[in-house]
Amino acid sequence: FINLALAPEAASSMLLPAAIGHRRAFEFFALGEPIDGRTALAWGLANRAVPADQVEATAGELATKLAARAPNSIRKTKRLMRDAEALWALMQREGEAFGSQMSSPEAMEAFMAFSQKRAPDFSNAG
């Protein structure tokens, strides 16, 4: 991104730090330098690193193993894992909603009522 004067997109600014840590993700985004297979493996971005002449054979072996597994089980596992990603998106939306609500007239009235030990009156807050 940085090499094109762009900012991260597609939630990568949230997902990459969650996967590899904030400092490593910032370095990756800020410097815009490519990483090799060993680094990707060390950072947890890859499951394995193989020599270039073994890439196709390894991919074929993995595809054969996956094809032999129960398709509905694989499908449900993938769906559950995507739901975990949806949780991150939900947390982001919650944070935005919480932040905007903190300065709302309703919240101001609720805080004032709490400090004055009275029930809040929201009739003029909306």
Can you name each region flagged by the protein language model?
Residues 1-30, 43, 58-62:
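CoA-thioester-processing core
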Residues 3, 37, 46-93, 105, ...:
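C-terminal long alpha-helix characteristic of the crotonase
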Residues 19, 34, 49:
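Short aromatic/basic micro-patch
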Residues 43-44, 117:
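Structural motif
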Residues 32-39:
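Acidic, divalent-metal-coordinating active-site segment for phosphoryl/phosphodiester hydrolysis
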Residues 16, 40, 77, 114:
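Terminal peptide-recognition signature
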